[in-house]
Amino acid sequence: MKVTTLTVDCGGTGIKASVLDKGGKVLIDFPYLKTPYPLSPSKLIGIIQDFVKADLRIKRVTVGLPGMIRNGKVVVIPHYININGPRSAVDPNLKKAWYGFDMQSILQKRLKLPTLVLNDAEVHAAAVIEGRGLETVLTFGTGLGSAIFSDGNLAPHLEISHATIRYGKSIDTWIGEQARRRMGNQLWSRRVKSLIQELYPMIIWDKLYI
């Protein structure tokens, strides 16, 4: 039986999905979907169900979510608890719905397919690491994503992006997409370089992927 995987990247501004074969070859890219707000867990599950219904070849599902995801369960999640998305007001009801939500178990039950839910940066990282030494992956988008692997084994997730770096700002705010657009690529790239220099003494990676 062919192993065909639906991969879903759930971001703060957009949701991207692809179907991959066993070797990681892309069989189909679904059209980019702007993240709809407000976004409840049930609404996101409905979106993923629609992807599965659109391609009968899908045999398993991998979902990447922003924030702290532990054993498939949401510990902390940004963006989706906000009424209108990133940096808008927090909706207490959305926060209550998302925090502690067992996305992996519930999604697997709904889809009736093997399902894995991880932090989005960890999913990206799994596609690029070599599995040797201490490897760190940093992703830049709405905010900063990160993943650390030791000899191919995923380390417990750290929300590095929540740390304060300059002027009382979190790394997310200091280095995110909004800052890049405001500053321009050249100045923003200097910030990225500065951030990497500050992170290295804390992690001391053998290889860094950006």
Question: What do the predicted segments below correspond to?
Answer:
Residues D120, G141, I210:
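Active-site glycine-centered loops adjacent to acidic/histidine catalytic or metal-binding residues
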Residues K2-G46, S150-R181:
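Short glycine-rich, Thr/Ser-proximal phosphate-binding strand/loop in the N-terminal lobe
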Residues K25-R57, P86-Y99, W174-R191:
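N-terminal phosphate-binding loop and adjacent alpha-helix
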Residues P36, P41-Q49, R60, I69-A127:
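Glycine-rich phosphate-binding loop and adjoining helix at the ATP-binding site
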Residues A97-A121, L154-S194:
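Glycine-rich phosphate-binding loop plus the immediately following alpha-helix
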Residues T5-D9, R60-T62, E135-T139, Y209:
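Short glycine-aspartate micro-motif
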Residues G46-T62, N71, L111-T115, N185, ...:
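Phosphate/pyrophosphate-binding loops at sites that engage ATP/ADP/AMP, CoA/4′-phosphopantetheine
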